[in-house]
Each structure stands twice: as C-alpha cells, then as structure tokens.
C-alpha cells in the first residue's frame, strides 16, 4: 500500500469522460548523479506523464565506509527513495510504503489531498515498492505507479511502471554510478 490522493477541481460529482482517453507516456527528462567527497550519492530522474504531469524520483544513500567493491555500494538501510508529483506549479511529495518518518501532508492550494502521511522508506535492492495512486477528475486519468530497484554488476536498474484506465506501461532505466543512462 502507499499514499493516495485525488485532485478535484469541482464540488460536484465528476462528469463522465469526454473524448479519447489521455495518452499515457513516460520518458526520462534528465538523469543526474552526484557523488560527494564523503561518498554519499544522489540520483534524480524526472519523468513526463501525459502533457502536464511530472514525477521526479530520487535515490540517495551512502556508500559503506568499509566497502571495497561496487557490489556493496548500496548498503541496506542507507538508501531512501523519494518521489514528487508536480501538477502545474504545485508539488506534492509521495513516499513509498514502509515509513520510518511520518509527517502530515501539507495541503496544496486548489488541490484536495487525502488525509495521509508522508512516507520515507528504506529501499533495498530487488524490492518492489508501491508509490502512489493518482486520479484527476477533470481528465478521468488514473495513474498507478510503482518503482522497483535492482542492482546488477555495478548498474542501478530503476523499473518504473505506470498504469492508467486504458494503458499499462513499464519503463526501465538503467543507470551506472556515474549517472549515465545505459540503453
């Protein structure tokens, strides 16, 4: 399970869908990797969904002090996954299930956000995390997204799955430790 919210632009019940269903697509806008002198690192991937929705997903962690091989770069308990959904100029943080830090949601102006909590979760390699369920009552678009983090021979594999009412799509992004996308 994960956090969920609905953006409702009207006080009445939503109207039935009009016209063709919105096209759901996801592609990487940018992949950034920063490794500081203390060997902490940060990956940022921005995905564009449809025409107006963006999801930015980040991985941050710290390399084990006694690590001597790239296979132990991801130390369990030291890697966090954070996602944000941007709707226009509003940004709503989304955290996977498995929180060890919980704070109340800050309501965004004009958006109806459910009474849920921020969730910050430890991401362990080869583990799948449910991120969020999103519904736009204007376009009748429902997006269910999840993220799966894997580690293989020094390569970070982010498998991100998006699902709408009419389409299911899975996007894999393989990133090495220099932040380069591997096709």
Curated annotation (Swiss-Prot):
Protein name according to UniProt: Putative uncharacterized protein YLR463C
| Entry superkingdom | Eukaryota
Q: What else is known?
A: Partially overlaps YLR462W and YLR464W.
Per the record, which residues fall in region Disordered?
1-23
Q: Which organism is it from?
A: Saccharomyces cerevisiae (strain ATCC 204508 / S288c) (Baker's yeast)
């Amino acid at each position: 399970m994960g956090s969920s919210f609905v953006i409702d632009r009207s006080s009445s019940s939503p109207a039935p869908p009009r016209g063709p269903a919105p096209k759901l697509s996801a592609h990487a806008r940018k992949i950034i990797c920063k490794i500081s002198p203390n060997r902490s690192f940060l990956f940022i991937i921005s995905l564009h969904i449809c025409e107006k929705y963006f999801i930015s997903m980040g991985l941050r962690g710290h390399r084990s002090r006694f690590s001597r091989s790239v296979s132990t770069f991801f130390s369990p308990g030291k890697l966090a996954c954070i996602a944000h959904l941007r709707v226009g100029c509003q940004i709503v943080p989304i955290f996977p299930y498995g929180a060890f830090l919980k704070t109340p949601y800050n309501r965004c102006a004009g958006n109806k956000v459910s009474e849920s909590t921020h969730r910050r979760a430890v991401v362990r390699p080869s583990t799948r995390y449910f991120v969020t369920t999103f519904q736009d009552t204007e376009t009748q678009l429902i997006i269910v997204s999840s993220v799966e983090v894997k580690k293989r021979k020094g390569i970070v594999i982010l498998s991100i799955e998006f699902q709408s009412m009419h389409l299911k799509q899975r996007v894999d992004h393989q990133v090495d430790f220099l932040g380069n996308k591997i096709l």
